[in-house]
């Protein structure tokens, strides 16, 4: 009887452990979709250089980022999660200032497209800490006016390719519902334009702290 009782207890423990591990897997497993919003801080460095002078200014201003993301996560065991994602964001950020003298340069952050992968570790059955990275494509609108009429006025938009890296923590808050907080740094490529007398370039970067709420299905 003692042997039977011990066997039943061991079997019950194994079933309980298996169910616990399965709950963890399901918590951070499968397709997901989310809405996100937070702090956005693009930093766009503009440089103008002629035969004698080189002037560089940085337009750094905070705003609000907003958008959505969808992805798929897979948990091969009860300790690790890997996944892929894609997202689309907008921004309210706009910065204006003097660049070269009697002029005005305004730079507005536009939409941002992201695609990448993430790897995380399950802290317990409700929390996931992760790192992420991937491709970014951000749009910037530039409005330049030269009040001395030395340079031509410009108004144009440009798409910048780049990459992003970040980290965050995610928490399961209900049946299929999760919330997460993350930091993301993005570095975009540079664009340049050249005339007979001047060379101009723009080089943007970006920092974000974002809170997201989503569902798994």
Question: How would you name each of these model-derived features?
Answer:
Residues 2-5, 12, 18-217:
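Gram-negative outer-membrane beta-barrel domains
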């Amino acid at each position: 009887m003692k042997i039977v009782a011990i066997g039943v207890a061991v079997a019950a423990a194994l079933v309980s452990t298996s169910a616990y591990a399965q709950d963890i897997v399901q918590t951070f497993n499968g397709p997901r979709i989310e809405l996100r919003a937070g702090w956005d801080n693009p930093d766009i460095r503009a440089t103008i250089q002629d035969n004698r002078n080189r002037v560089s200014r940085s337009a750094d201003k905070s705003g609000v980022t907003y958008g959505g993301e969808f992805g798929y996560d897979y948990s091969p065991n009860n300790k690790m999660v890997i996944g892929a994602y894609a997202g689309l964001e907008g921004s309210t950020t706009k910065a204006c200032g003097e660049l070269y003298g009697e002029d005005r340069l305004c730079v507005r952050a536009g939409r941002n497209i992201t695609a990448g992968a993430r790897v995380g570790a399950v802290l317990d059955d409700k929390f996931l800490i992760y790192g992420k990275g991937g491709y970014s494509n951000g749009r910037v609108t530039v409005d330049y006016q030269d009040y001395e009429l030395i340079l031509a006025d410009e108004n144009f938009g440009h798409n910048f390719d780049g990459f992003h890296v970040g980290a965050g923590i995610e928490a399961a808050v209900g049946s299929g519902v999760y919330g997460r907080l993350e930091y993301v740094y993005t570095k975009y490529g540079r664009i340049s334009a050249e005339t007979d007398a001047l060379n101009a370039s723009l080089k943007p970067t970006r920092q974000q702290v974002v809170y997201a709420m989503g569902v798994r299905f």
